[in-house]
Amino acid sequence: MLRGGCKASEKRRHLSESLSWQQDQALSSSIYLLRQIGPTGFLLKEEEPEKGDFRVLLGNPHECSCPTFLKRGELCKHICWVLLKKFKLPRNHESAFQLGLTEGEINDLLRGIHQVQAPQLRASDETAQVEEDGYLKQKDINAGDICPICQEVLLEKKLPVTFCRFGCGNNVHIKCMRILANYQDTGSDSSVLRCPLCREEFAPLKVILEEFKNSNKLITISEKERLDKHLGIPCNNCNQLPIEGRCYKCTECVEYHLCQECFDSCCHSSHAFASREKRNQRWRSVEKRSEVMKYLNTENEGEAKPGCFQEKQGQFYTPKHVVKSLPLLMITKKSKLLAPGYQCRLCLKSFSFGQYTRLLPCTHKFHRKCIDNWLLHKCNSCPIDRQVIYNPLIWKGIATDGQAHQLASSKDIACLSKQQEPKLFIPGTGLVLKGKRMGVLPSIPQYNSKVLTTLQNPSDNYQNITMDDLCSVKLDNSNSRKLVFGYKISKQFPTYLKNPTTGQTPSQTFLPSLPHKNIICLTGRESPHIYEKDHIGQSQKTSRGYEHINYNTRKSLGSRLRQHKRSSALSSEDLNLTINLGTTKLSLSKRQNNSMGKVRQKLGHPPRRPAYPPLQTQNAALSLIMQGIQL
């Protein structure tokens, strides 16, 4: 008899697009069966707590308490979940897209004659073995075993499981039992949960809570990454790591992948490709390609037919030496992996004392035998988050300590190579000192010039100075350039270039000429630094005119000026200024405490001549040699 006196709905012959979308939502959503009300009534709960619980009744027509069904009257994802997940109907089965089913069709559905997978998990009639702790022995998990709450295959979902300790010994997801515990509304931790299969006592609530807490520690950050990130797979063209969005894999080359942008630019166009959008999807052959790609394939491949890509043919397994290089850990008596809830997520069995575990780059831990068999014979990626273990583009190889290492992408290496070296810029000249050590000032070699007071070390290092961006100033031997420099020097140093006897400025000033290439500079003893503080004009004199002031370390020039401040002229022994026709030479010595020397200017009272104090270092000498002008 039909429920509520409703008429039998019209039979549908084809699956509509809207219903197909609802089926996709049902298969991709996390829906849990909290309670079964009779043979055709089901209380469901979604993972999002704000959506609440929904009641589904199968009949003619089907009913659901969700807003989507109440508004449209069409099959919602909750009804589709019961038909596809609970009763294992194929998506294209006639009973899967009808608005209602007759009594005969419902009886066939309950008997499972349409199921394409193994029948649902039931309590075994065999006598369960009792362990020493009083609990039943956990049953082994087979390939077709499913969780009675989420209806997912246990070995495919790879989530930690618990088992019924007092009734049947069957396995259930720990997460699902935690959700069921919230629905049963147990009063205290000492209460016992009911088994969703045998309806007997399942396990104490405190045991489930401890297992749930520990099992959450097995979840890594990589599992929470978006599925459109292909972890561990770099683009062989642009070195993007990981590839995001659609990923393309060459069907002929070993581990050759391209991102969407590089694939569209016709990179590696001579071979056929397979693609996937998410890392948990299968690779599918790329059939529809642009006209440019078709033309290139026709020209390069000749009579080769792309065909459908078979994943087994293009499967690449992890090399044996890479598997052996992964860290190997032995479980000790005090290991945390012995706590309830910790287990290998491949075989879903607990860890035991003395066993060996392998640690993957994504920090997942497995039994050594389980993960070795997986990597060597099944797949080259982690079975949980699908992160690729070995890729020739980023793998460095086996380290001497047995640890596995990975290289950074070539893009990162290129960025490191492009880092600028430290530079010391001398204002106004365009000379740039490039070197690995900071604070080393150059000493320009002297040609045909006289040396007065210099402190040099024969073991001083040599460095190269490059000419960089001289702008309008060009150092050569032309007379025009000498005149230009002479004019600029006369403007900057009108006092020092005057003839003391005549009081006139010479018509020409001869400046040193510097070669443009391979200028060898003698540095200080190690790394002297100079701060020309509070005296900008003095730095301009040194840079533009290549002039250096010689301060006598035995008796400073300032003391001599103070002694003869009433005299009208200075002795030539006290100050010897010379313009050198060769190249000016700058030599500095290092302070004992590696501090920076300072050149300070002390101005006298007008109209007296300004006094120039000695350099504030113990054994440093700064020389300015000018030749051709009599003071």
Curated annotation (Swiss-Prot):
It is an enzyme of class 2 (transferase). Its EC number is 2.3.2.27. Disruption phenotype: Male mutants fecundity is normal. GO terms for biological process: apoptotic process; positive regulation of extrinsic apoptotic signaling pathway via death domain receptors; protein polyubiquitination. A zinc finger (RING-type) spans 147-199, 344-386. Expressed only in testis. A zinc finger (ZZ-type) spans 230-281. Keywords: Apoptosis, Metal-binding, Repeat, Transferase, Ubl conjugation, Ubl conjugation pathway, Zinc, Zinc-finger. The keyword Transport does not apply. One of its GO terms (molecular function) is zinc ion binding. InterPro entries: Znf_RING, Znf_RING/FYVE/PHD, Znf_SWIM, Znf_ZZ, Znf_ZZ_sf, Zswim2. Polyubiquitinated. Polyubiquitination is followed by degradation via the proteasome. Zn(2+) 2 binds at residues 250, 253, 268, 271. The keyword Protein biosynthesis does not apply. It catalyses: S-ubiquitinyl-[E2 ubiquitin-conjugating enzyme]-L-cysteine + [acceptor protein]-L-lysine = [E2 ubiquitin-conjugating enzyme]-L-cysteine + N(6)-ubiquitinyl-[acceptor protein]-L-lysine. Dimer. Interacts with UBE2D1. The SWIM-type zinc finger is required for ubiquitination activity. E3 ubiquitin-protein ligase involved in the regulation of Fas-, DR3- and DR4-mediated apoptosis. Functions in conjunction with the UBE2D1, UBE2D3 and UBE2E1 E2 ubiquitin-conjugating enzymes. This is E3 ubiquitin-protein ligase Zswim2. The gene is Zswim2.
